[in-house]
């Protein structure tokens, strides 16, 4: 990390926290410390890895048996303890082993956020097989693609997904057997050949030998998650046990380091603003509002909640009022959702009527967190705002920003985690200096193996272990990462790059805005200009020119939206909660704007 000299003048509060932050960081990563790391050869590349990382994630699940009767999974009016979950995982693993699933095989999961997704995940890992997390929003043909691409030995899916897959099963099985376990099927629903209901698979396992835990190495495949691309077929990112274990320790490191830095500041008589904020009584765990078939839901929520013996409350679908009801009832310490969900939660008319005092952290990842949202979180809950920047291809997070650090630099994605090397690479392929903009490249123990069956994509995105994120950003003098935008989410206006995230951040500072998405609109004179789709808060009133005046006061004139569409319905999103700008462009460009 860069060294900053504060001896020439008294340090500000932010600089004081920075000194404690660096001291805590250095102490926790020193040789022999809990988060010490070494350089290891991983796939022929020198790679930073944590010394204390577990060799596989199946050990994490095995250790959770110690939590016994504590609540593990909550879904609507259903509750399942750790002991009950272990019994079902063992039974399902025995069933899968009996039909031939073993080390190196794959098991696909295709369902909503049901408890069975979690149980199927751990049962698959116990056998040394890899999970294929299929997008539950996919259509039948998209499911066919994912199954053909990944060739799973078994498919665990709910009734809605099964109906979409059945027409393709015979063709898919031409290349090999694919056993089906149906989840939460209607009692009178039929079953295809070589299929069984979940409850029959679990109860029938009583007559089968108990499947032992496989011998699993760090570089064995853990899961395949498909990236949420907006063009062409999605790509299956192959994640390893080493990568997921590294991500788990990245999350634990930041929480430990931030707490240690605050304790140092208080002990030095320099308590930072907000350090006296205390959440109410809570239980370790989270209300999960994002899908389990993405790394935010699985690697960044399911894994750490399980590691601490916490309670995971699953939502069938996103609804801010239901989420607030669950937070009040279950009293989780965290809420896991993308920033648009956090904004809807705070804007909900139910927010002030519900008890959210249990939340120690309210934040999310998957998209940029606008500075105005950071301030709203700080003002409206007892917990602290937090965010993480990451990608499917890195098993979760690259950097984290939370607590006082977030308030000091709310526009930053945080400091890259200890095992993450970073480069900012310009268009000419050279590394950029501090403050210079370029594409972020990362290398570390949590970087994925590559894309399944995509050698050309791997050649384009991986260079000597460095993953090209496709995100444009820069590092400041303190080593904090700032994201400017996606490399392909820009407007090129008369040769000037306009980053959509900057436009959106300015628009969101207007109090009438509920949702906003900026995108490129073709223009004969400028090549491209900025267009924006906007949804207003209930009972709000805003004219397009007033929005432009507001935006012009915050950003350069050439970045101000020339086309404004006010929409009554929520903006379209993909399964991970991100706005689908391609859909917006297709729907709006060419229609009257204001």
Regions found by a protein language model. Give the residues of each.
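Structural core segment of the AMP-binding/adenylate-forming
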Residues: 2-32, 98-99, 129-204, 538-540
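Conserved AMP-binding/adenylate-forming core of the ANL superfamily
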Residues: 52-53, 69-114, 118-122, 139-144
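Conserved AMP-binding A3 loop
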Residues: 81-83, 222-254, 258-265
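AMP-binding/adenylate-forming catalytic core of the ANL superfamily
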Residues: 138, 144-145, 155-157, 444, ...
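Conserved pre-ATP/AMP-binding loop-to-beta segment of ANL
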Residues: 203-226, 233, 277-285
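Conserved AMP-binding/adenylation subdomain of ANL enzymes
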Residues: 245-289, 293-333, 348
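Gly/Ser/Thr-rich phosphate-binding loop
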Residues: 307-310, 329-337, 346-408, 421
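Conserved beta-loop-beta connector loops within the AMP-binding
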Residues: 389, 409, 421-441, 474-478, ...
């Amino acid at each position: 990390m860069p060294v900053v000299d504060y001896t020439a003048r008294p340090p500000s509060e932010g600089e004081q926290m920075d000194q404690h932050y660096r001291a805590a960081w250095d102490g926790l990563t020193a040789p022999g410390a809990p988060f010490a790391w070494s350089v290891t050869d991983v796939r022929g590349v020198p790679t930073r890895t944590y010394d204390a990382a577990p060799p596989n994630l199946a050990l994490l699940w095995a250790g959770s048996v110690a939590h016994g009767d504590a609540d593990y999974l909550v879904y609507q009016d259903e509750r399942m303890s750790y002991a009950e979950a272990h019994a079902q995982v063992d039974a399902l693993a025995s069933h899968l082993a009996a039909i031939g699933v073993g080390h190196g095989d794959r098991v696909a999961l295709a369902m909503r956020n049901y408890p069975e997704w979690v149980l199927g995940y751990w049962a698959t890992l116990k056998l040394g097989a890899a999970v294929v997390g299929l997008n539950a929003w996919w259509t039948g043909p998209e499911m066919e693609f994912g199954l053909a691409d990944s060739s799973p030995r078994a498919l665990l899916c709910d009734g809605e997904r099964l109906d979409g897959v059945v027409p393709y099963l015979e063709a898919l099985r031409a290349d090999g057997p694919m056993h089906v376990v149906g989840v939460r099927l209607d009692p009178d629903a039929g079953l295809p050949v070589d299929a069984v209901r979940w409850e029959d698979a679990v109860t029938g396992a009583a007559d089968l030998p108990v499947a032992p835990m496989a011998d699993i190495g760090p570089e064995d495949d853990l899961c395949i998650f498909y990236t949420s691309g907006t063009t062409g077929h999605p790509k299956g990112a192959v994640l390893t046990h080493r990568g997921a274990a590294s991500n788990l320790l990245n999350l634990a490191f930041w929480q430990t380091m931030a707490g240690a830095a605050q304790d140092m500041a208080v002990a030095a008589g320099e308590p930072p603003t907000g350090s006296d904020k205390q959440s109410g009584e809570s239980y370790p765990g989270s209300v999960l509002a994002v899908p389990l078939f993405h790394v935010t839901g699985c690697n960044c929520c399911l894994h750490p909640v399980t590691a601490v013996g916490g309670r995971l409350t699953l939502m069938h679908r996103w609804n801010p009022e239901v989420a607030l009801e669950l937070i009040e009832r279950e009293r989780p310490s965290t809420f896991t959702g993308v920033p648009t969900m956090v904004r809807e939660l705070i804007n909900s008319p139910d927010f002030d009527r519900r008890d959210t005092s249990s939340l120690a952290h309210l934040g999310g990842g998957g998209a940029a967190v606008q500075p105005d949202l950071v301030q709203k979180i700080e003002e409206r809950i007892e917990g602290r705002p937090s965010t993480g920047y990451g990608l499917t291809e890195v098993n979760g997070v690259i950097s984290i920003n939370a607590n006082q650090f977030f308030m000091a630099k709310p526009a930053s994605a945080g400091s890259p985690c200890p095992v993450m090397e970073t480069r900012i690479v310009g268009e000419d392929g050279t590394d950029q200096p501090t403050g210079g903009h370029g594409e972020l490249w990362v290398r570390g123990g949590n970087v994925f193996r590559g894309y399944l069956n995509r050698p050309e994509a791997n050649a384009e995105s991986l260079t000597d272990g460095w993953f090209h994120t496709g995100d444009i950003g820069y590092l400041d003098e303190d080593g904090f990462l700032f994201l400017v935008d996606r490399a392909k989410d820009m407007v090129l206006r008369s040769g000037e790059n306009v980053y959509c995230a900057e436009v959106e951040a300015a628009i969101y500072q207007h109090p009438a805005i509920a949702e906003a998405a900026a995108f490129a609109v073709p223009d004969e004179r400028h090549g491209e200009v900025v267009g924006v789709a906007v949804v207003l808060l209930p009972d709000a009133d805003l004219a397009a020119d007033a929005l432009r005046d507001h935006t012009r006061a915050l950003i350069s004139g050439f970045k101000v939206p020339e086309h404004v569409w006010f929409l009554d319905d929520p903006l379209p999103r993909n399964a991970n909660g991100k706005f689908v700008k391609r859909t917006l462009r297709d729907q709006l460009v060419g229609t009257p704007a204001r």
